[in-house]
Amino acid sequence: MRKQNGKSDLSRRGFVASAAAATAVASVLPAPAVLAGGRPRVVVVGGGAGGATAARYIAKDSQGAVDVTLVEPSRAYYTCFFSNLYIGGFREWESIGHSYGALAANHGVNVVHDWAVSVDRDNRSVGLAGGGSLAYDRLILSPGIDFRDGSVPGWDLSQQNRMPHAYKAGSQTQLLKAQIEAMPEGGTYCMVAPPNPFRCPPGPYERISMVAHVLKQANPTAKIIIVDPKEKFSKQGLFEEGWQRHYPGMIERIGPDFGGDMVEVRPEAMEVVVDGEAMKVDVCNVIPAQQAGRIAAAAGITDDSGWAPIVPHTMQSRADENIHVLGDAALQGDMPKSGFSANSQAKACAMAVRGALTGSSVFPPRYSNTCWSLIATGDGVKVGASYEATDEKIAKTDGFISQTGESAELRMATYEESLGWYDGITADMFS
């Protein structure tokens, strides 16, 4: 793991160009023969960083040779990445919302706003909640996450309005922000953090930082408690340094050594029970254990882990060569579950799908990821790595991370870099 040293400028153009280069290296793999008959059909389920990117690149780069349909129930997509900044007051809600209109207008993607509820692998079709089905030659599943039933005793989705998860961006994010802002003076915010693996490893701890930022200004005697089943977490040294600097005495973390892995909640009483001891809280943000979005299990491509194993070079399901799985839902190896990862995987997948269906050139993929986090105003940190496809997994080849004790100028530059990345990736997904 190498240190972060120096300022880099990740503009929209630079992000798209560097990401494209990541999927192109010198040697060309043999391409399959072009399918006979009419245009081959690709159905993409899920319109996030994986699915929207895959749909856009297949449609754009095939220049109409492939019929691409994107199935996504929401007409506006709100990014989970940067939703913590909305909670912290650094972004307006509308700034993290995006529409699918340009995918249709600019690239001819057929956008179907419906839920995909079933997959008939024998007949290669996807069933829709609204009725009917969509036939495919290749299916790309990028459904994100669902929560594991019973992972936090006392909590299920029926309690999400009393104790929100806010880990799928949308009304839950807005609800949690409103609850934080309505806390009584000197009140207590509690987060029940998830076990590994889960979406966006630094995400819960950036959220803690953003909640602390809000409370420091509006409710400085409030307390924040993290109940955490994990012994350690992403960027731990950086977050703990930042919490001590910006929010001294406000944040307490209860790890597994003190019962953080033995928690239950009582939503009606607004209580959190840690190792048998109950405490009253005013806001409780429960982030449960996670698994692949339910359509992956419905397709029969998940294993006992709840995630969908894939072939690292193509993101194909190990259970069905005509299905590819992207992003959070994939069991792929060393890459974290992040929007950057999903976008990187989508480009490799799009290249593989075009090669299989049209005979276009296919290159060995290279993957990358960076996760930025904001701790306080202008105090940005990051962690990232490069990866390669092996026969067994997507394997990390090198990495970097911000360092404790960095200058304010470098931290501001890191935050500004994250803003450029956000503009770049959302353009890469939706333009």
What are these regions (language model features)?
Residues G384-S431:
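C-terminal auxiliary extensions adjacent to catalytic cores
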Residues M1-L10:
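N-terminal secretory signal peptides
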Residues N106, N110-S118, V126, L134, ...:
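A Rossmann-like FAD-binding core segment of flavoenzymes
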Residues A342-R366:
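Internal hydrophobic alpha-helix adjacent to the cofactor/substrate pocket in enzyme cavities
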Residues L157-M183, A278-S344, G355:
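FAD-site-proximal beta/loop scaffold in flavoenzymes
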Residues L35-N110, P195-Q236:
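Beta1-alpha1 glycine-rich phosphate/pyrophosphate-binding loop at the start
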Residues P143-A218:
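Glycine-rich dinucleotide-binding loop and its adjacent helix/turn
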Residues D9-P30:
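N-terminal export leaders
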